[in-house]
């Protein structure tokens, strides 16, 4: 469409999908990139289509992150400051709130950089790295893809997403060298042998000064359950509709999340609330069930308030793990003659942490387009203009001879 006198094109740049549960092919549940059946349920017709190439919808987190970096790089390299025809930006939307259609082997959607419970996947953190600036990168960031809990004999590539100019990897304080840089943001360290401990990635700027750092630590055996609550900053309201997210994690004895834990957690709820449950890989996706497995050591469930305020106590138990308990309270809302004027959205504040739009330029010109005035061709000179006339339907051709196959 036209905006003023300029052409504006909107496009979807990455529709691939990946289950959050699938780290990589080197750790549980050992999912190779693209592995799965060749079918998907169409969002348009709601029919299952067989014998289609569904590999793009069956990523693991390693390959899903890499794909997101590659696809965004296609637009980032054409950002403002790189000529007259540029990408003006991007926004990340997801389709993870449905279990009525799917693509790939699972029977619910795995689209987007978070799952349906808004638990981040690795591409979420990759986008934090790539999008930390109005146009040009302003704040260098770094993220190590995956986890650091493997069997002793595993040798695997380690991927790091960073906006630094150089990235060095350290394992228990020993340097493993600098990563191979591709697509500006992706650094690959090939054939890294697993050793328990601390894996660190350090980013350096163009002057060789450290500008960002990230680390992964090997977690111990699963020992305990941890519960926490995510709710509105204004509190949980007893209006019969307000909901909170209950987060459950499996931790080691030192309080580190166990990235390979998939324990089945049983929940008990006491008090004025309705259990709405979460979602996980399985025949029925555990919809509404009070038995819910963690995936990669974490999951979430929704709890809805009733119209009666009060204290709600939730207990979580699992075989072989120390149980956990948490209490939360819902606050009353004013009701007159059976009606309430309370609208939850009225209390939500916009997130303005990014700050005001800058008044000064947010990018530097790195490339300037120059208009072509004329061209000289080895043949068919009268059609040489077709090589730069901005018409995709026209083209210049030579006369079929090698010695005339040139144009300047």
Feature locations, PLM:
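Short, small-residue-biased leader/transition segments that mark boundaries at the very start
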Residues: 2-9
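Substrate-binding clefts and catalytic carboxylate motifs of secreted carbohydrate-active enzymes
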Residues: 10-240, 253-258
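A structural signal for short, hydrophobic beta-strand segments that form beta-sheets
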Residues: 144, 272-276, 372
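Short, surface-exposed loop/turn motifs at beta-strand boundaries within globular domains
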Residues: 153, 162, 241-243, 381, ...
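Short, solvent-exposed beta-strand edge segments and adjacent coil->beta transition regions
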Residues: 155, 298, 404-406
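Core sequence-specific DNA-binding domains of diverse transcription factors
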Residues: 158-159, 169, 174-362
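Disordered, acidic Ser/Thr/Pro-rich linker "stalks" and the adjacent N-terminal cap
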Residues: 347-408
